[in-house]
């Protein structure tokens, strides 16, 4: 048995030093805005585009990473807009998907739409939320750590992944975009 001091002297003499992980200080900024969960209020959906849910799912295919963001109408479970990216953490998949949804919304400018999402950093970001009121879209968010609040979207994500891998038998990365044509 060797004492701690003796071990320290031996390591110092031999030039052995531990490498510690350096903590990077993050300056506190504005906290993300959390919106109430409007789906829990018994929202009555009587027609299309009244309540749209969104979520992002990630998957690997032949060594490549993909992120797929979907926007789905709760009235008829129709995929209204989607965006696919091969870059991890790409915020533009959310924005491109939202732009597709806004194009549909422009056809019915007076209709108030509820967009229900999780509390992800992009969905709660300032730039994402500044776009919504411009097009008469009300934001609703799931409770933290509760994916069952957005169960319809989570189920569609699981179903799409199962379809991609089990039914389409994808063999190369080029076919992923062809496969997503069937999502529309």
Question: What does each of the following model-derived ranges do?
Answer:
Residues 108-123, 147:
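Acidic/histidine-rich, metal-coordinating catalytic segments
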Residues 63-64, 124-126:
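Catalytic cores and conserved motifs of cyclic dinucleotide signaling enzymes
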Residues 83-108:
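Active-site beta-loop-alpha junctions of metal-dependent nucleic acid enzymes
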Residues 129-133, 145-148, 152-184:
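Charged alpha-helix within mobile-element recombinases
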């Amino acid at each position: 048995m060797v004492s701690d001091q003796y071990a320290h002297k031996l390591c110092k003499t031999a030039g052995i030093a531990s490498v510690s992980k350096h903590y990077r200080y993050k300056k506190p900024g504005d906290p993300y805005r959390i919106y109430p969960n409007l789906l829990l209020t018994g929202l009555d959906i009587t027609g299309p585009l009244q309540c749209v849910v969104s979520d992002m799912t990630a998957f690997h295919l032949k060594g490549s990473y993909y992120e797929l963001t979907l926007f789905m109408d709760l009235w008829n479970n129709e995929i209204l807009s989607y965006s696919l990216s091969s870059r991890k953490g790409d915020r533009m998949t959310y924005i491109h998907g939202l732009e597709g949804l806004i194009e549909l919304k422009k056809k019915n400018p007076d209709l108030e739409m509820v967009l229900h999402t999780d509390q992800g950093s992009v969905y709660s970001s300032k730039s994402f939320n500044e776009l919504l009121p411009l097009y008469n879209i009300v934001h609703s968010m799931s409770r933290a750590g509760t994916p069952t609040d957005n169960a319809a979207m989570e189920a569609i994500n699981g179903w799409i992944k199962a379809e991609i891998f089990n039914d389409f038998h994808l063999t190369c990365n080029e076919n992923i975009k062809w496969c997503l044509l069937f999502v529309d």
